Design a protein with these regions (language model features):
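Acidic helix N-cap motif at the loop->helix transition within catalytic regions
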Residues: 26-30, 58-67
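Short beta-strand/loop segment that forms part of the nucleotide-sugar
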Residues: 43-56, 77-78
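Short, acidic, metal-binding catalytic loop of nucleotide-sugar glycosyltransferases
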Residues: 34-46
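Acceptor/aglycone-binding surface of glycosyltransferases and processive sugar-polymer synthases
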Residues: 73, 79-95, 99, 111-192, ...
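N-proximal low-complexity "stem/linker" segments adjacent to membrane-targeting elements
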Residues: 1-37
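A conserved acidic beta->alpha catalytic loop
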Residues: 53-61, 107
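Hydrophobic helical membrane-anchoring modules
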Residues: 1-14, 158, 162-163, 186-265
């Protein structure tokens, strides 16, 4: 939307794209370069790429610090403990952005879906958005083993937790400040189940979820131990079912940082 001549320039939407990493020195620079190029070419947001390192031992931190020195729109957060959920919680709750998001470092999910999710949340029509590998229009390339486990897991979630979203664990999500303030503090998991818990708590308490098909290509070098992760997720589902039956949920009111970014910077 163009501004009226002589009127103040509208403040651009502040968007953080978080990339959690663990021992990804070999691919981090390439991935950050791709994300930055996409954002520069496909958005008018005031964006920032936030790399969060969870205890890497391969020099990932050195690569991240080099990227920060080279690019003013890259930020680095270093944590001693592992866990994707822990990384997202730290980055999102420290953010001054209007919209927070994340993508896996392997960029398995095509970035073309990001503007649609961000715009959907920014419009106020949705509170959070997630990519899905399991909708009819999704384009997914992965092994039979991963496809089978993923479909079984998501069917289990629907059966046990009575959810309507299609894919809990796709590493491609967008959230509003409201979700970070009210939902994230209630999430118990610090690892892979964080995504599922985020979506389930949001849906069960009336937050609107945008669920869209994405193009997704499996990373052959993925560090995810899929069988162990699946077992941990099953235990997480059982815990969450118990919480929904017998626990209490109070939307938190976590205080998030006020933006220190210069308008249009």
């Amino acid at each position: 939307m163009s501004a009226t001549p002589g009127s103040p320039r509208p403040t651009p939407l502040r968007v953080d794209v978080v990339i959690p990493v663990l021992n990804e020195a070999h691919v981090l620079e390439k991935s950050v370069t791709e994300v930055r190029a996409f954002l520069a070419a496909n958005s008018d947001w005031d964006w920032r790429v936030v790399v969060v390192d969870n205890g890497s031992t391969d020099g990932t931190d050195r690569v991240a610090k080099m990227l920060v020195e080279r690019h003013g729109d890259v930020q680095f957060v270093q944590l001693p403990q592992r866990g994707r959920g822990r990384a997202l919680r730290q980055a999102w709750t420290q953010s001054d952005a209007d919209i927070m998001s994340y993508t896996d470092v392997d960029l398995s999910t095509e970035l073309a879906a990001l503007p649609k999710l961000v715009n959907g949340v920014a419009s106020g029509q949705y509170d959070l958005g997630t990519g899905s590998r399991l909708l009819p229009d999704s384009q997914t390339t992965r092994s039979f083993k991963r496809e089978f486990i993923s479909r079984c897991y998501n069917l289990m979630i629907k059966a046990v937790l009575w959810t309507s979203f299609s894919d809990a664990q796709c590493g491609f999500k967008v959230v509003s400040r409201r979700v970070v303030q009210e939902i994230v503090p209630n999430i118990k998991d610090q690892a892979w189940f964080f995504d599922t818990e985020l979506l389930v708590l949001a849906e069960k308490h009336g937050y609107k979820i945008m669920d869209i098909p994405v193009r997704w290509i499996e990373d052959d070098d993925s560090r995810v131990k899929i069988v162990k992760t699946a077992w941990d997720d099953i235990k997480g589902v059982a815990r969450l079912r118990w919480t929904l039956w017998f626990g209490t949920f109070q939307p938190a009111s976590a205080s998030l940082p006020v933006s220190s970014r210069a308008p249009g910077a």
